[in-house]
Every structure is written in C-alpha cells, then in structure tokens.
C-alpha cells in the first residue's frame, strides 16, 4: 500500500520546512498531497518528484478567497492546477479587500 503524507506548509512553518519534510518523505518513498493553501502548495507539489496532488478550491465559492485573490488559480482543460508563472508565488493579494476579515493587524498600535 502506498503511503501519502498530507504535509501543510503553513502548519510546518513555511516553504523551507515543507521542502525538508518532502525530502524526508521521498527518502521513504512517501507521496505528498498537502491540504489547502493552493496558492502555495501548487508550486511545492510541482517542485518535487513525490508530489502527488494539490487540493483546489474554487475562489468563487468562498468570499474571503475571492476578495483576497482577484486572479484565482486556474485549471487546464484536464482539470489540473496551472502553476502560476508570475514572480514569487505568482499571485497578488488584495490587502485592502481583506481588511474587514482581519481580527488583528501589525498596524494596530
């Protein structure tokens, strides 16, 4: 039976920590299928040989995601996530549009 690890970059502490876990998983022939955060995990799954699948959420079904990411992750004709090609993670965050969802801001003094 194939083992699959549901490693989440936000839970693990970031991209570097996720990559360390991915390397350990690969050494044990474990596949990776991270949970959520498609804007991060699409890149990570595509970057490792043991990346199996990334979850996809339609931003139109979630008001916060729709406000946060005006240009959602796209799918190709086969239903596969198209990894953004723009610099960084390839997505723009609309900070002013998500301010109503914030419970705390580092700007609060």
Regions found by a protein language model. Name each.
Residues 1-80:
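Shared catalytic-loop signature of beta/alpha-barrel
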Residues 68-109:
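C-terminal extensions of enzymes
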């Amino acid at each position: 039976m194939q083992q699959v690890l549901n490693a989440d970059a936000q839970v693990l502490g970031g991209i570097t920590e996720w990559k360390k876990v991915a390397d350990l998983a690969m050494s044990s022939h474990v596949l990776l299928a991270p949970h959520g955060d498609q804007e991060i995990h699409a890149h990570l799954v595509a970057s490792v040989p043991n990346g199996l699948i990334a979850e996809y959420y339609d931003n139109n079904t979630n008001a916060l995601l729709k406000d946060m990411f005006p240009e959602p992750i796209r799918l190709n004709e086969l239903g596969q996530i198209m990894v953004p090609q723009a610099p960084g993670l390839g997505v723009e965050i609309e900070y002013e549009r998500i301010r109503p969802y914030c419970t705390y801001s580092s700007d609060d003094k």
